[in-house]
Amino acid sequence: MAGIVGTIWAGVALRRLKAGADPDAPPRAVAIPAPWEDEAGEALAALAPGGGPATLPSVAEAWIQRLMLRGRRLGLLDGADAAESLAAGLRAMILARRGAPGAEIWRDTRGEGRFVLNLPAFLDGAGGFDAPAYRAACALTVQTLDIWGHGKAESLRLGFADLAGLLAGFGLPYDSHEACDVAAAIAGLTRGAAEAESGRLATRFGARHAVALICPTPPEETAIPGLAKAARAALAA
């Protein structure tokens, strides 16, 4: 695909395998980044339209390009630079495995769009949680979902996944009080960051949607340094 030239995709080493969407599905040829496990190939086989060969760069770039064009056509992206900034952010998010949209966006089918962020992917090299990157990811997904909904969605479906993996990264039992505090803080951070971006969009285009996320009050502190403070700051923004 011509859209891959000159992007981050061009430097990604791929490996090819046969994978099916489920054990009973016929396998199809897929190509995923070389370090990724076979389960990622199965996920790509399930998400890619049709039943023929599929590569992650081409399949992802297809929906990214659709969003760029839609955003510009609707006036939700101010020109080529804004469109490319959105695209670059989405490419980086997919490659870092920090988040992905629902099947309706991958397949370009009718339906309410959704986006899920992968919590363990925001663990940083210092052994903490990269709250600024998470806030930025929330903002990017809100903008993406707004474009998917043609700027008319009454609510946006943004969520997070693998809380257990995040807790394991900090050695916290899933059923502990500390884990509950972390979950509440993550929910607060997610909602605050998403509402801040929704507010920015409302300032430019008029209020039209809310973030569909139940948010408990964040705790004063959590076992993850800085997380509770980041959640309170996001909710106060």
Describe each model-derived feature in a short phrase.
Residues 1-237:
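Extended catalytic cores of very large enzyme megasubunits
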